């Protein structure tokens, strides 16, 4: 708590250690075609707070009363790319963090997320069979 480190270099091992040891991971990307950080976060039990864009919007299920009730929320998204909206998302995430039951639901849903090739592969097979008449 109350600690900050600034490193002006990239070290992949250190990056994974930091992400795995964090409760929240901020991803304020203006554009993000896909991104892997949120996927790593899910597996580490780290909750992403991200701009709702590209692959981040496709892979993070935003916290809402409905998504938390259905055990689907995996993080916090902000729609407008602005410091104010980022701050609102951070403050909301910190507020939810205080509710340990809700937080555990978000962490668990993220850790259970499946972004393997199994589902898309089955869908491709189904599609190929459909178009080939088989």
Placement of each model-derived feature along the sequence:
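Short coil/turn segments at secondary-structure boundaries
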Residues: 7-10, 105-107, 123-124
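Catalytic binding pocket for nucleotide-activated donors in carbohydrate/polymer assembly enzymes
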Residues: 12, 17-105, 111-112
């Amino acid at each position: 708590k109350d600690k900050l480190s600034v490193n002006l270099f990239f070290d992949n091992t250190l990056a994974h250690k930091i992400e795995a040891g964090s409760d929240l991971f901020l991803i304020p990307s203006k554009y993000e075609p896909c991104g892997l950080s949120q996927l790593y976060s899910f597996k580490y039990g780290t909750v992403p707070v991200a701009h709702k864009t590209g692959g981040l919007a496709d892979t993070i299920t935003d916290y809402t009363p409905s998504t938390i009730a259905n055990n689907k929320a995996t993080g916090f998204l902000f729609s407008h790319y602005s410091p104010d909206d980022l701050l609102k998302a951070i403050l909301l995430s910190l507020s939810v963090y205080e509710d340990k039951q809700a937080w555990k639901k978000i962490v668990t849903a993220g850790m259970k997320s499946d972004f393997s090739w199994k589902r898309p592969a089955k869908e491709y097979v189904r599609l190929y069979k459909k178009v080939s008449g088989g």
